[in-house]
C-alpha cells in the first residue's frame, strides 16, 4: 500500500490527484491532507479519505473525528517529516516554496506542480532535484522522454504552449482584456493564477526556468513553441535528428497518475487519442513582442541570482491585483518590470536569503501595484 500525503488538496491539482486515487483506493492510502484553511471542501475530503493527519495553515481545531490537525509552520514541519512514500505538493504560488524546501531537505520523494519553488530555490538545492517527480504536463513529458537518455545526446528540449486565449487577438486590444476573458483557457482546467500566467505566457517562461533546473539543461537548449491543439506536451530533439514527443489529450490526471505510480502506468479512462480525428498539429514561434513576459522570464533565468525569485514573486502580486480587477491586463508586465528594475538586494547565499528576498519583493511589488491600481 502506497502511503501518500497531499499538500494543497483542495486546489485544482490536489483535487485531481484525489480523483486519480479514488480509482486505486486498494493501492493508495492518503495519510495526510493539507490546505490553507479548514474549508467545507477539506472537511469532505477528510470524511472520505480518513487520513491520519491533516495540515492546515490557519485553524483552531486540534483534531477532527480523532484525526490529528497540524497547524501553522510547526505543523507543516511535522507534516513533511511523516514517514510516507510520496508527498504531492499541489500548493499554488509562493506558499509552496517552504514545503518544497523542507521536503527536499528531509530527502522525501516529492511530486510537485509548484514551479515557483523550483525557480526560487534554484541553484541552492539543485543536487536535490533528482528526488522530484514533475506533475506539470510539459515537465512530465520531458521527464518521461529523458529518463533513459544521455544528456550529451540531447540537442534541445521543446516545451509547448497552447498560446492561451489571446494568441490571435491584436496586441492593441490587450489593454481592455477582462478577468473573465483571461480565465477562459482554451484547453486546460487550472487554478486562477496559472490560468492568467498562461494568458500572458509568463507560465511558459517560468517553465523554461524550471526545466533548466530540473533537467540540468542549458537555456540555449530549451525552446518554446506555440501548439494550439495541446496534444504534444513536450519534445526532445536528439543530436542524430530524431525527435521524440509525448502526446495525449490535455488532462492533468495523466501526469499526476504517472508521478503517483512511477515507474508504472495505470489505466485512467477511455479518453485516448483518436488520430483519425486530429485534423492538424500546428506549431508557431511565440510572439515575444506581443507577450513580453515570456522573453523577460527567460532573461531573468539566464541572469540567475535574485532575478528569478523577484520575477516570480512580482508576478504573483501583479496577477492577484489583476484578478481583483484593480489593474489592467497590460499592467501585469509593467509592474513586474518595474519591480525588477527597482529591486536593490543581491545577496543570495542561503535559503534564508531567498525568504528575505521574497518578503522584500512582496513589499516592493505591492507598493508598485497600488500605484497602477490608482490610475
From Swiss-Prot:
Belongs to the DXR family. Its cofactor is Mg(2+); Mn(2+). This is 1-deoxy-D-xylulose 5-phosphate reductoisomerase. Mn(2+) binds at residues 136, 138, 207. One of its GO terms (molecular function) is manganese ion binding. Its EC number is 1.1.1.267. Pathway: Isoprenoid biosynthesis; isopentenyl diphosphate biosynthesis via DXP pathway; isopentenyl diphosphate from 1-deoxy-D-xylulose 5-phosphate: step 1/6. Pfam families: DXP_redisom_C, DXP_reductoisom, DXPR_C. GO terms for biological process: isopentenyl diphosphate biosynthetic process, methylerythritol 4-phosphate pathway involved in terpenoid biosynthetic process. The gene is dxr. SUPFAM superfamilies: 1-deoxy-D-xylulose-5-phosphate reductoisomerase, C-terminal domain, Glyceraldehyde-3-phosphate dehydrogenase-like, C-terminal domain, NAD(P)-binding Rossmann-fold domains.
Amino acid at each position: 500500500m502506497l502511503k501518500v500525503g497531499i499538500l494543497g488538496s483542495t486546489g485544482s491539482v490536489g483535487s485531481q490527484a484525489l480523483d486519480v486515487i479514488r480509482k486505486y483506493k486498494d493501492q493508495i492510502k492518503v495519510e495526510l491532507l493539507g490546505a490553507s484553511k479548514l474549508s467545507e471542501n477539506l472537511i469532505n475530503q477528510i470524511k472520505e479519505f480518513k487520513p491520519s493527519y491533516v495540515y492546515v495553515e490557519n485553524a483552531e481545531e486540534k483534531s477532527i473525528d480523532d484525526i490529528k490537525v497540524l497547524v501553522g509552520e510547526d505543523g507543516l514541519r511535522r507534516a513533511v517529516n511523516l514517514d510516507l512514500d510520496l508527498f504531492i505538493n499541489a500548493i499554488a504560488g509562493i506558499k509552496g516554496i517552504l514545503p518544497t524546501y523542507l521536503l527536499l531537505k528531509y530527502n522525501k520523494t516529492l511530486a510537485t506542480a509548484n514551479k515557483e519553488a523550483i525557480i526560487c530555490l534554484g541553484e541552492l538545492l539543485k543536487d536535490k532535484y533528482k528526488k522530484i517527480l514533475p506533475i506539470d504536463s510539459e515537465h512530465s513529458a520531458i521527464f518521461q522522454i529523458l529518463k533513459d537518455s544521455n544528456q550529451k545526446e540531447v540537442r534541445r528540449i521543446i516545451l509547448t504552449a497552447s498560446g492561451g486565449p489571446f494568441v490571435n487577438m491584436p496586441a492593441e486590444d490587450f489593454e481592455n482584456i477582462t478577468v473573465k476573458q483571461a480565465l477562459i483557457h482554451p484547453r486546460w482546467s487550472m487554478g486562477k493564477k496559472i490560468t492568467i500566467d498562461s494568458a500572458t505566457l509568463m507560465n511558459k517562461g517560468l517553465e523554461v526556468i524550471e526545466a533548466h533546473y530540473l533537467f540540468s539543461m542549458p537555456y540555449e537548449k530549451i525552446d518554446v513553441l506555440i501548439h494550439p491543439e495541446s496534444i504534444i506536451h513536450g519534445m526532445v530533439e536528439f543530436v542524430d535528428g530524431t525527435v521524440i514527443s509525448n502526446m495525449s489529450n490535455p488532462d492533468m490526471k495523466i501526469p499526476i497518475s504517472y508521478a503517483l505510480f512511477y515507474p508504472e502506468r495505470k489505466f485512467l479512462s477511455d479518453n485516448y487519442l483518436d488520430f483519425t480525428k486530429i485534423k492538424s498539429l500546428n506549431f508557431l514561434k511565440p510572439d515575444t513582442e506581443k507577450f513580453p513576459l515570456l522573453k523577460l522570464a527567460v532573461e531573468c533565468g539566464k541572469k540567475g541570482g535574485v532575478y528569478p525569485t523577484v520575477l516570480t514573486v512580482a508576478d504573483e502580486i501583479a496577477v492577484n491585483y489583476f484578478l481583483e480587477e484593480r489593474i489592467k491586463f497590460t499592467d501585469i508586465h509593467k509592474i513586474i518590470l518595474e519591480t525588477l528594475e527597482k529591486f536593490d538586494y543581491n545577496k543570495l547565499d542561503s535559503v534564508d536569503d531567498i525568504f528575505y528576498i521574497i518578503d522584500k519583493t512582496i513589499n516592493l511589488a505591492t507598493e508598485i501595484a497600488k500605484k497602477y491600481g490608482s490610475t
